[in-house]
């Protein structure tokens, strides 16, 4: 991808991605057995073996300095390699081409590799995310080996990563990829209790439902899953599944999908996974399967995602249960009308809160907030985050500073605050306190350090006194 301008600039891109296990080909002449997956597949076998061997050597060499923490990345002029060992003996490697500026010098084209533009922490997080997404839909590498040996694992890796790697848009990765957080929808207590009551009623009526998650406007309201499992499921829902179905779904905008519902109940509900047509008894369908609690009970579940207007509910049911069209009809008739009413209530409450707060003028600051304890994330910098792109409302130079501040925070355990004045005269502030991180970009060119500090205090008091409920 080239950026417009006098000099051509090329964004970072994926050069190669591979997974290997050195124990699978320990003898000379068996090196190809180590390779479980390699992208791009067109690369000659000898080159694959050479690249894997080099990574193996780097890992072994760095182990001599720190046996428990071998290499995480390798910097070269043209590219950067990232290493991750998600399970013992299994190594994932991602090679990213450094950004390049193509300049004219004395009538000749000169390439300048801008290796400082890449942040290790961002792309290491992307690599870890690749594993977590694979694990969500396929389970662990080790379990595949137990069930069907190395051929089953290779087959699963090929099927998953062949498609998934196409959704990696490395040029738009940033601090949000490091956090991998969850955006929570702010609710008053009464409406939150309505949501809780709805979930309890449905779980009682459909007693085969094991876990439930409730989202509104792509933001989480309630989840019965463990945090780490919900974190990666949330990523899948908001960046892959929901964007496929985006359409105007405001209450009253269209006529109800099923106006014939008894008792004059409106019904906007539909399945986002599973059957498309409930009237066809012969229709073939299947729900995607997910794996949760892989460190403990190792559960395989059907994932049912059902939506009415802007509200979405995920129902997770044990994969051993056979789900029929009749069950889907029962779920549809039970959940559809109730979810439609609840979605309208949430919309009404949300709009009334917005009216009370008033239409304030555009603030002179933008921020990213992250809470490590509950994974709550909030950003006014990102306009949209999908697999295709991340639209940010600030310059790349400022995003880079945010990443640098975050890297500094990682190196120390204590609470701290960092204030930077950018070349463009913006103030960039990072604040780490009690498992929470706040990053603010202030557009106050004439302010001094004391005034900037005061602004940050005001911001914390108004925006972060209570992150989940609006009182």
UniProtKB/Swiss-Prot annotation:
Family statement drawn from the similarity comment of this UniProt entry: Belongs to the CCZ1 family.
Source species: Xenopus laevis (African clawed frog)
Protein name as annotated: Vacuolar fusion protein CCZ1 homolog
Main location group: membrane
Keywords: Lysosome, Membrane
Record flagged with keyword Membrane: yes
Pfam families associated with the record: Intu_longin_1 (PF19031), Intu_longin_2 (PF19032), Intu_longin_3 (PF19033)
Gene field: ccz1
GO biological process per UniProt: vesicle-mediated transport
Cleavable signal peptide: none
InterPro entries: Ccz1, CCZ1/INTU/HSP4_longin_1, CCZ1/INTU/HSP4_longin_3, CCZ1/INTU_longin_2
Intracellular or extracellular location(s): Lysosome membrane
Gene Ontology annotations for the cellular component aspect, listed alphabetically: intracellular membrane-bounded organelle; lysosomal membrane; Mon1-Ccz1 complex
Lineage: superkingdom: Eukaryota
Record keyword Membrane present: yes
């Amino acid at each position: 991808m080239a950026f417009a301008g006098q000099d051509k600039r090329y964004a970072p891109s994926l050069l190669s991605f591979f997974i290997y296990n050195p124990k699978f080909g320990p003898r000379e002449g068996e090196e190809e057995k180590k390779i479980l997956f390699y992208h791009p597949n067109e690369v000659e076998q000898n080159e694959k073996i050479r690249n894997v061997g080099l990574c193996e050597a780097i890992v072994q060499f760095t182990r001599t300095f720190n046996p428990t923490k071998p290499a995480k990345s390798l910097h070269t002029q043209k590219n950067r390699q990232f290493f991750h060992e998600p399970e013992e003996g299994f190594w994932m490697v991602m090679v990213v081409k450094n950004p390049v500026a193509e300049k004219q010098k004395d009538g000749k084209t000169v390439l300048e590799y801008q290796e400082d533009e890449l942040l290790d922490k961002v792309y290491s997080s992307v690599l870890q995310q690749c594993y977590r997404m694979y694990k969500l839909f396929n389970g662990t590498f080790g379990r595949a080996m137990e069930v069907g040996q190395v051929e089953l694992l290779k087959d699963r890796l090929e099927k998953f990563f062949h498609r998934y790697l196409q959704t990696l848009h490395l040029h738009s990765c940033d601090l949000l990829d490091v956090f991998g957080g969850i955006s929570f929808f702010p609710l008053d207590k009464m409406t939150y209790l309505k949501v809780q009551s709805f979930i309890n009623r449905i779980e009682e009526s459909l007693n085969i439902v094991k876990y439930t998650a409730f989202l509104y406007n792509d933001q989480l309201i309630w989840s019965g899953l463990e945090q780490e499992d919900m974190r990666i499921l949330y990523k899948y829902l908001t960046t892959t599944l929901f964007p496929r179905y985006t359409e105007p779904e405001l209450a009253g905008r269209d006529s109800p999908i099923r106006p014939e519902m008894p008792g004059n109940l409106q019904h906007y509900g539909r399945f986002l996974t599973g059957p498309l047509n409930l009237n066809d008894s012969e229709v073939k369908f299947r729900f995607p399967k997910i794996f949760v609690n892989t460190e403990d009970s190792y559960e395989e579940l059907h994932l049912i995602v059902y939506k009415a207007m802007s509200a979405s509910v995920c129902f997770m049911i044990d994969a051993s249960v056979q789900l029929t069209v009749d069950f889907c009809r029962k779920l549809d008739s039970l959940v559809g009308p109730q979810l439609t009413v609840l979605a309208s209530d949430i919309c009404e409450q949300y709009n009334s809160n917005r009216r009370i707060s008033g239409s304030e003028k555009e603030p002179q600051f933008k921020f990213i907030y992250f809470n490590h304890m509950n994974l709550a994330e909030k950003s006014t910098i990102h306009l949209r985050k999908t697999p295709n792109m991340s639209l940010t409302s600030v310059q790349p130079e400022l995003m880079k500073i945010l990443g640098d501040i975050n890297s500094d925070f990682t190196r120390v355990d204590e609470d701290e605050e960092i204030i930077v004045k950018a070349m463009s005269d913006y103030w960039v502030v990072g604040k780490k306190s009690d498992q929470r991180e706040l990053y603010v970009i202030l557009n106050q060119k004439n302010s001094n350090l004391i005034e900037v500090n005061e602004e940050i205090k005001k911001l914390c008091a108004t925006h972060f006194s209570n992150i989940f409920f609006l009182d």
